[in-house]
C-alpha cells in the first residue's frame, strides 16, 4: 500500500468531525450538518473545478454524515469520478463511498463497473486490490454477473501478485456464496487446487476456504485436493519440516491454515491407503502435541493449539474409521471436562456427544459418566449444562439407563425453562428405549409428569398409554400406580389424563382391593373433573362410561353425573354431546351391546415412537440424535405404536388433541380467518407493524387466563397448530415474561406476527417492551420472546396477545388474554396477629373494603386453598385469625407511582359450600380488582 502523504490528512474533515462531537444537542448537530451539506452542494455545483483532494474531502464528509444516520442524495457522481484517479487515497475513498452508499439499482452502476474493469485490467496490484475489495463488499448478483468470469482468471494467472491472489480468492468465495449459479466451473478449478502448495500463507489460507466451499457442491471437480491437503498438513505439523515456520503463532505453526485444511478433508471420505496412512500420522502428531506441556502460559498459545486439536478430533469423528484414534480423542476430551476454561468444557462435551454415537468409542465415552453428571450439577453456565444433558442422552444404554434417567429427573427440577421440554422428551425416550422392567418405565413417566407436567407434551402421555395397552404384564401395576398418584391434593392435568385413560381401561384390575373400589376410583377422578380443561373433561366423561361397563354398581352414580345440568346444559358443545350420548347409551343399551361398544382398546401397531420423531423435529437435522439412531443401531426391545388419534363424528370438525376413548368427536379448532375489524381501543403494537384485523378471543381463553392468576408458568393456549407457553417472574413493580410459540405441525409458519393489544387506559398504567420474533417458525420448532413489564399504576384490564401467521396457504388469526394481572406485583408481607388486626381496623372505611360471598366452584380443599393464596402473591399468615378454618394474608402491591398495602380474609363454610372473601386496601379500585381475581379461584 502506498504511503500516505502529510497533505492527505484532510484537516477540514477533522474539524467537521470535531464540531459534530462538540454539539450539545441533536438540534445543534442537525444545524451543523445542514450547514455543511449546503457548503458541499455549493462546491460541487460551483463553476470552479474541484481538485482530487477537495473531492475526496467532501466525499468523506458525506460518508461520515451518512454513517451518522442521515440520508445522502447527492455526491455519487463525484465519488465515481474519484475511481478514475491515479492517486491511491482518492481511489480508496471513491471505492469506500461506492461500497457503502451505492445500491445495485443505481443509474451509475455501469460507470462503476467500467471503473472496476479498468482497475482489474491495470495490473497495478494496489488498484486491483481495491477493485476486488469493492466487488466482495457489495457482493450483489449484478456484481457476480459482471465479474464472476474475470476473477478466476486473475486468481490462476502466473503473473498475479500474492496479495491480489489472496483478495481474488476471497472475492470469488463471496460471489459463490451469494450467487453460486453465476460462478462457472472450468479449467481454472484444477489450477486453483494447486494453490494449496503456495508458499504465501495468505494465498493458501484463502484458497483453502474457497476450495472447501466449492468442494461441498462440486466434489468431483476438487477431489484431487485431498492428497495435496494431507501433504501440506503433514509438512506443517511435522517438527522436522520447515514449511511455513515463519508463520508460527505463539509456538503453533500456521494454526488457522491447519484448521482449514482439516475442515477441507471432512468433505471427502477417508482417502486411499497411502494418503490415509500419512493423514493418520498427522492426526496422531496433533494428539501427541496436545499431551505436551504448554510452551507458553499465554491464552493465545492455548487457543491456537486447541483450535487445531478440536478440528482434528472433528475429522477423526467424521471419518469414524480408526478405533485407536477415536479412543485417544475421547481420552483427550475427557481431560478437558474438568478444565478451568468454560469454553473448553463446552467444546469437549459437544465433541463427546458425537463420539458417543460411534461403535468404536461409545464405551470409552461411558467411562466419563460421573464427570458429566457432576458437570450437570455444578456448572454455572446453562449452555454447558445443556451439553451435559445431550452427552448423557448420547452415552445412555441398557447398562446405565436407570442412573442417567434418575440424574436427568433430578436436574429437571431446577433446569432452565427454555430446555425443560427437550429434557422431558429425552427422559421419555430413554425410559422407553431401555426399559427392561416396565414398572420402572411407568414410575419414571409419572414422576416426569409430577416434576415437569407443563412441559410434558401429548406425545409423551400418548406413548405411556400405548405401552401400557400393549403390555399385559404392566397393566395392573400401571392402574395401581396412577390411582395412588391421583390421590395427591394437587395433580397436574396430564396426570389426570393418563389416570383417567388407564383406569377406564384397567381399573377392574385393582377394583378387588377395598381401598380402590369402583366407587372410590370414580370419586377420585370426579374430584379432579372441575379443575380440568375441556379436552380432559371430555376424556373423563369417556372414562365414566367405561366404568358403567366395568362396574355396574356405580352405574346409577355416573348417570346422575351425566344427567346433571352442568353436563347436559354445558356451554361447551363437545361436553354436552358426550353427556347426552353416554347417558342415552347407558340407559338403552343391553349389557352385551355395552360390552361390545366399550370393549378394551386393542394393542397399537408397532411403529417409530412419536416422541423420538418430535425430538428430531425439535433439534433439527444432522443432530446427535440422528447420528445416534443412524450410526449406532443397538438391539432394543421397544413396544409401542402411533399415538391414539381420535376419530371425529363430524367430517367438518378437527380431531381433539386429547386421547379419545370412544372417538366421539373433538374440540372445535380455533378461528382460522380474520373477522371484521372492530373499532375502539388503542393498538400498542410492540411486536410488528402489521395492522391486520384482530381475531376475537379464542374459545377457552378466559378459563386459561383464570388459571394463571395464581401461577406463572404453563401452557396458555393450544390448538392443532400452535402451542403458546409462558414462564414469568415478577419483582416489585417489574416483571419479565417469556412467551414460547411452538409449531405443532411439520409445516412452516410464515409471516408469524405476534402483536400486543392494550386498551387506552391500560397503555398508561402498564408499560410493555419487547422485540419482534422470527417471521418463520419451522415445523416442530419453538421460538421464544421476552416481554419486559413495568406497572406504572393499578389496572383492571389485561393485554390481549394476537398471533397472525400463514399455515399451508391459509391465514391464521388467534387472540388470547395475556395473564398480566394486578396481583402479579404483590410482595408478601409477614405480620403478627396484633399487627394484622391493628392494620385491619385502620382500613375500615367503606371505600377501602370489598367483600364477596360466593358459592364454591371447586372442591373445598384446605391445602389447595393455601397454595392458591400463596400463588396469588400474598403471604399466608398462620395462627392469626381466631377461627383456624379461616385464611388471612397480607402483602403490598408495588407500582411505579405508589405502594398499596393489602389485607385479605377468606372464610370458608363447608356445610353451605360457600366462601366469604374480604379485601381491604388503601385504594378502592385495588380492593375491587383483587377481590374479583381471587374469587374466581375457589
From Swiss-Prot:
Biased composition (Low complexity): 646-667
Bias-annotated ranges (Pro residues): 668-677
UniProt-reported outcome of changing residue 55 to Q: Strongly reduces phosphatidylinositol binding. Abolishes phosphatidylinositol binding
Location relative to the cell: Cell membrane; Membrane, Coated pit
Keywords: Cell membrane, Coated pit, Endocytosis, Lipid-binding, Membrane, Protein transport, Transport
UniProt key word Cell membrane: yes
Functional note: Component of the adaptor protein complex 2 (AP-2). Adaptor protein complexes function in protein transport via transport vesicles in different membrane traffic pathways. Adaptor protein complexes are vesicle coat components and appear to be involved in cargo selection and vesicle formation. AP-2 is involved in clathrin-dependent endocytosis in which cargo proteins are incorporated into vesicles surrounded by clathrin (clathrin-coated vesicles, CCVs) which are destined for fusion with the early endosome.
SUBUNIT field: Adaptor protein complex 2 (AP-2) is a heterotetramer composed of two large adaptins (alpha-type subunit AP2A1 or AP2A2 and beta-type subunit AP2B1), a medium adaptin (mu-type subunit AP2M1) and a small adaptin (sigma-type subunit AP2S1). Binds EPN1, EPS15, AMPH, SNAP91 and BIN1. Interacts with clathrin. Interacts with HIP1. Interacts with DGKD. Interacts with DENND1A, DENND1B and DENND1C. Interacts with FCHO1 and DAB2. Interacts with ATAT1; this interaction is required for efficient alpha-tubulin acetylation by ATAT1. Interacts with KIAA1107.
Official protein name in the record: AP-2 complex subunit alpha-2
Species name: Mus musculus
